[in-house]
Amino acid sequence: MSTFILALLAGAMRVVTQSYIYSQEEYYYKLAQEAGEAGTAYANACLDSNGAEQSWGSVPGGIGPLRPETNCKGAVNPSYEKYVFDEGNKFRTTFEVGDLEASTRSTALSAATAQISSIGRVEITNGSGVVLKTYTAVVKKSVTWPADIDATRTVSGTYRTCAILSNNVWCWGNNDKYESNEYTMGQLGDGTTVSSNVPVKVRSVGDMRNGKIIDIFAAQFHSCVLTEFSSVRKIYCWGNNQFGQLGNGDFGDGKYSSVPVEVKPPTGALAADFAGNNISAIGGTGDVSCAIAAGKVYCWGSNTMGQLGYGSPGSPKSSATPVRINSGGYSRLPNNYSATKLSTGGSRSQTMCVITTEKRAYCWGQARFGQLGIGVPHYSGYGNATRVKDLEDVTDISQDGYTWSGSPDYVTHTCAIAAGRVYCWGGAGRGQAGSPGSGTPKKHIEPRLVGGLPGVALQVEVGIAHSCALMNDAGTKKVYCWGDNRLGQLGANRTDIQYSFTPQPVNVGPNGLPASERVVSLSAGANRGCAIMSDKRSYCWGLNDNGQIGDGTSGSENNRFSPTESLFLRPVQNRYIY
């Protein structure tokens, strides 16, 4: 637990940049405030680990106050860092947390309360360790554990996870260059390019400060949120901007933003679509972002495979501001369409889909391996939204895969719910489509029914090479997954299965989803999945190389083959999580 808390502090304490500080004095007081908040975060974590009981200070067994270099009993640990932040010969920050002002001792967890008082300090030094001046700030936080815990939404990009917690956005995982990519990304949105296996708060800008966070998506190396303030909705994006996927009018090799930037609305006659609260949904895939505004679909970013749904693949190559996708023509979106939902997933794919009010699905973009579901493959992609073949009464759709790099394409696929049943198409070689497929590589070019799923499908989510569905089986909600399981993506607690064409039940019980709670919703992406339960706690499984699971561990040796509670995803009203 101590290692986890140290990591938690590292994620909690991110120095704000000078551009947001009006004077040096304000800067140091701001740092003192943040150091104090890091102390309240530490106290929260210690309370969590000790059943809401104070373990430091003057209580039995307590050694002293909480400081960065102490454990939860207040005892100094030589292996811990002495300061929250140490800027060498300039300044350093620390905190001290004393006894709780309202004790939680002998109080039921469902009603426990505490007043945490933390003193944050900034010590200005002369380069030799001598303190020249000290700035202090006292931070007091009321902490509660009510029975009704706030709901949360999680999304998974490539090697990172993001969540909406108490109307703030938090991300964790990779935040810089990855593998062969030569460009810095900043996809955690906290103003740095430092990766973190604990949540860091995405910088709140514009209407993110005072408005409501309505929606979020995480694509390959960028993310976006939809906000509403004073009945006006806006979109903010951060991360990689090589192809204009942030929508702020800028793009180019090496372009990125480590803090959210506002998406520029279209101009001219189309500007009205983005006015007021007309934006109803956002979504993204690979290096493209999309939104539904006034019932119409707009996209911005890369168009190499037609994923803008505008013009021909590669013409234009990209757009740094929203463009309305094409409509009209045989088997395409009708001119008078009204969109209701964008496809989820898509951390690495070059395909997008939309559901209309007629409950029909239309897809566009990369089509080489049948992932559009239109009955024919097409190497160069489709720049027009085309109807998915033979599906009626479509209520949900999700897509993901590897086509951003061109290989391995056989893992690219799409799944949808039609009339309560799950259908999948596209790449099928690892079982992700629920049946083997044909050709080389194995694929389905039109929807195929996934067998072995009991009851009525409520939600479908896909990752790079696996799929999951939430089923209502005679009144009981159950999660099933199929496809690649080498990293634990199926959550079935089965290390003996590498690939499965047959849906496997996600593990339920002491080492899985709690049997006493209902599954409320799913989220998936890349090589993992998550389920939100009726007690509003989240459980995730699969790849954990960058700490994406959220249980305080990281590294491929900590991949989870069974659902594991994501402690970071336990927001509570009036409770601060860092």
Regions found by a protein language model. Give the residues of each.
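Beta-strand/loop motifs with alternating small/hydrophobic and polar/acidic residues, enriched
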Residues: M1-W145, V572-Y578
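Eukaryote-biased RCC1-like beta-propeller repeat architecture
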Residues: S142-Y578
